[in-house]
Every structure is written in C-alpha cells, then in structure tokens.
UniProtKB/Swiss-Prot annotation:
Pfam families: SIS_2. The gene is gmhA. This is Phosphoheptose isomerase. GO terms for biological process: carbohydrate metabolic process; D-glycero-D-manno-heptose 7-phosphate biosynthetic process. It comes from Pectobacterium atrosepticum (strain SCRI 1043 / ATCC BAA-672). Homotetramer. It catalyses: 2 D-sedoheptulose 7-phosphate = D-glycero-alpha-D-manno-heptose 7-phosphate + D-glycero-beta-D-manno-heptose 7-phosphate. One of its GO terms (cellular component) is cytoplasm. Residues 37-193 form the SIS domain.
Amino acid sequence: MYQDLIRSELKEAAETLNNFLSDDANIQSIQNAAVLLANAFKAGGKVISCGNGGSHCDAMHFAEELTGRYRENRPGYPAIAISDPSHLSCVSNDFGYDFVFSRYVESLGREGDVLLGISTSGNSGNIIKAIAAAKAKGMKVITLTGKDGGKMAGSADVEIRVPHFGYADRIQEIHIKAIHILIQLIEKEMADQ
C-alpha cells in the first residue's frame, strides 16, 4: 500500500547523506567542531546549545548525551541546552522571542565556552542574536545549518552545513547524525588526554 512511498523516502534520505558525505569539507568541519568542543571541555569550558522546533530537540539531545552518556560510560561533560520553559516564556514575554537564546548566553556564557546554534534554514533570528552574544563574550561558535547557510553563513568558527534545498527533515536527519559523530569524537578526544 505505502511501500513505494517508504522506499522513496528512504532513498531520498540516503541520497542526502551521500551528497553530504561526498564533500570532504563536511567531514573536516565535523572533525574541527569536535576538537574545538573537546578543547573547551579540557580547559574548563562548557557548551550551550540552542535551536527552534525540531532543532531545539536536537540541541537538547546533544546536551543530554554529553552530560549523560552516548555509547560508553564516562564522566559527564558540561553541556546546557537552552530549554528551561520559565526562561523561554519570561524572555519571550518581556523582550520578544528573538532574545530567548541571547539573554541566556549573556547570563551564563563566558570566554572559553562554545555555542552550538542549530537552524535548518540558517535564518533563525534568535540564533543569530545568540551568535552575536556569544562572540561578545569571547565564546567560540559552531553552527549546524542547511540549504545555503542563510543569514548564519560565515558567522561561525565552524559551520556544518547540509546543502539540501528540500524539506527540513532531510537536513535534520544529517544534523542528528553529525551530533552523534561529534559526541563520539569528543569522547575519543577526552579519553586520549
């Protein structure tokens, strides 16, 4: 009944992954991001992650697997996803939704920390403001974007961009794969210290 649709969806997902994989710059960006994060942890820094909608879920997923565990038992790493409902509703109400992430970064970010901003379009105003706040604090910035990178293109120390121009779910599928690889590489870097 739906087998052709299922095959088509899985085929498109595989093609998106293969296109991403075929560009060595994408592989290098993931490696650079992992090393940047591990070096921040080694120096006593933390990562603050943020995103909207499904990307918000990815930001939380990233943080929980760093503070909790991924595949192996090991010490937790300092990671915070900006997801506190009281913070989000307060700042949205009092300042506007564009400031929900930047206010948090202004409050808790410091030099030596890393911001991970996730936006499939690269055009999320609140992530753009968070990037500016992070830079003002002397933080490093990693972005996970899609399409042409949008307004966030070129704004990060490391950008992992999925150059897919279709629906956002394909971009999100690569983002979560990149997140899992980042954690795997961070664990390796931290174990090798």
